Amino acid sequence: MATKLIKHGSKAREQMLEGIDILADAVKVTLGPKGRNVLIEQSFGAPKITKDGVTVAKSIELKDKIRNAGAQLLKSAATKAAEVAGDGTTTATVLARALAREGNKLVAAGYNPMDLKRGMDLAVNTVLEEVKKASKKIDSQEEIAQVGTISSNGDKEIGEKIAKAMEEVGKEGVITVEEAKNFSFDVEVVKGMMFDRGYLSPYFVTNSEKMVAELENPYILLFEKKLSNLQPMLPILEAVVQSQRPLLIIAEDVEGEALATLVVNRLRGGLKVAAVKAPGFGDRRKAMMEDIAILTNGELITEDLGMKLENVSLKSLGHAKRVTISKENTVIVDGSGDKKNIEERVLQIKSHIAETTSDYDKEKLQERLAKLSGGVAVLKVGGATEVEVKERKDRVEDALAATRAAVEEGVVAGGGVTLLHASQALKNLKVDNKDQQAGIELVIEALKDPIKQIVENAGENGGVVVGKLLEHKDKNFGFNAQDMQYVDMIKAGIIDPAKVVRTALQDAASVASLIITTETLIVDEPEDKENPMPMRGGMGGMGGMGGMDF
C-alpha cells in the first residue's frame, strides 16, 4: 500500500484552492458570446479546439496531488452540470470557485464552517425558488432556435437546425448527432428507435469521453430468453467475426459466463460487441422485441417456434446503420426494415389501441407506436477540416442537450441576469447567527461572478455593468455582450434553460460546501522516482474462432 501524505486545516484548503484556480482560469475564458477558444493537445492526431467548458475541465490533470484534488472536485461540478442539463458547465465552475475561495477566507477569519454552509444552503434554495418563479415555458420554434443558438455560442444555424429536428420528430423525439462526409449541415429523418436500456457492462464502451458504445453498421441479434452460456452461439459468433462487423445482442438478460466472455473478447479486439437487456416486461417485452426485429429486418429468436441459437445464421440477424448505447438508453438509427412491413406493424398496433379498454395498456401501446413510427432525426455536421467538424459537433451536442432542458423546465433571462436579480431576494432572509448571515452574503457576492466574467471576456468592466443592472427593477434587464448594449434579455432572445441555471448553482454550491468544510486531506505521497513499466510481450495469436477467446 502506498504511503500517504496528510495535510490539515487552512494549509490543505489553500493548496486545494490553488488547483481550483488553475482549472477555473482555464475554463472561465470560454464563458459568454465573446468567450475565447482553448486549444487542447491530444495524445494522437491534431490538437482539439473548443469553447466547451466541460471539455476543457476534463482535459486537466495536475501533477501536485493536493492541488489536483481541488481541481478534480471542481471538475465534478462541471461534469455533473453537463450530465444533468447539457450546459452551464462554465457557470458552475465560475460560481464554485467564487464560493470556495471567499468561503475559505471566512473560515480562516474564524467563522464556523458548518454555519457558513447552513447559510449558503438557505440562500441557494431561495435563489432556486426565484429561478423557478422566473421560468417561462417555451412553445414556438423560434424560442427553441434561440436556446440552441445561445448554447452553441451564438451559432444561429445550429439553433435553427435543432428547432427543425424537433419539429420533425416532436419535442420528445429521438435526435442524434453525427459527422457529415461533406461541408454541409443537414437534418435527416431516418427509421429508428430509442429504448430505455443501457449497456450491461461499461467494458462495452467505445467512446470513453462520452461513456457510450458506438457500433457502426452492426448486426443485431434478438433473443427472447436469458443468455448465460455462449456455447450454442459459437457458430453465429464465428460468422460475425468473419464478416468484420460489430454485433449488438438484445436479450432478456446476458449474465455470468456469457457476459464475462463477451467482455473479454471485446477488450481483446476479437469481437466488436455490446449487449443490452430487452425493453419492457413479460408479453410486452416480446412485442417490443418483435417491433425491433421489423425495424431492423431481423428475426426474434424464440424457442416457442422451435428456433435454436445453434441454427441461427446471419440472415436471421437485423441490421442498422448505427447503434449508440449509453448507460441508460439504446438508440438504433436507420434500421434496414422494409417500409411496408413497418407500416403494417403500425396499423396492427393502432388496431390494438382501438380495441383495448385498459388505460394502462393503451398508454403502453401508444408508446410502442411512437417509437416505431416516430423515426430518428439525425443532425449531420460538416466542415472544412476534421478539427472544425469535431469542434462544431461538440457544440451541437451541447446545444441539443440544453434545448431539451429548456423544453423540460422552461427558460429564464440569460447572460447571468437571472442569478444576479435572484440574489436580491436574499437580503431579507432571517437567520440564527452572524456566521449563517455571512454564508448568505457569500452567495450574494458569488452570484455576480458569472455576469462579471461574461462582460470581462467581452472586454468591458464587469463591476460597472453589475452596478448598472442592480439599479433596475426589471428582472429581465441585462447586458448583451455580443452587441455591447443594455437590453430586455427575453425580448432580445438571450435566454437560458431554467434547468441549466438551477443545475449550475446546485452543483457549484455542493462542491464549495465540501471544500470549506474539509479539515483533513489524505493523498498518495509522490514517489521519489517513477518505476518504468515492464515491457510486455505481444498478445500472441488467439487460437480458434478467428481471434476470439472462449
Swiss-Prot record:
InterPro entries according to UniProt: Chaperonin_Cpn60_CS, Cpn60/GroEL, Cpn60/GroEL/TCP-1, GroEL-like_apical_dom_sf, GROEL-like_equatorial_sf, TCP-1-like_intermed_sf
Tagged with keyword RNA-binding: no
Reaction catalysis annotation: ATP + H2O + a folded polypeptide = ADP + phosphate + an unfolded polypeptide
Main location: cytoplasm
Cellular component GO terms, alphabetical: cytoplasm
A Pfam family this chain is assigned to: Cpn60_TCP1
GO molecular function (one): ATP-dependent protein folding chaperone
Subcellular location, record wording: Cytoplasm
UniProt keyword terms in alphabetical order: ATP-binding, Chaperone, Cytoplasm, Isomerase, Nucleotide-binding
Gene3D superfamilies the UniProt entry points to: GroEL, GroEL-like equatorial domain, TCP-1-like chaperonin intermediate domain
Residues that coordinate or bind ATP: 30-33, 51, 87-91, 415, 496
GO biological processes: protein refolding
Keyword RNA-binding: no
Function: Together with its co-chaperonin GroES, plays an essential role in assisting protein folding. The GroEL-GroES system forms a nano-cage that allows encapsulation of the non-native substrate proteins and provides a physical environment optimized to promote and accelerate protein folding.
Subunit relationships: Forms a cylinder of 14 subunits composed of two heptameric rings stacked back-to-back. Interacts with the co-chaperonin GroES.
Family: Belongs to the chaperonin (HSP60) family.
Protein name per UniProt: Chaperonin GroEL
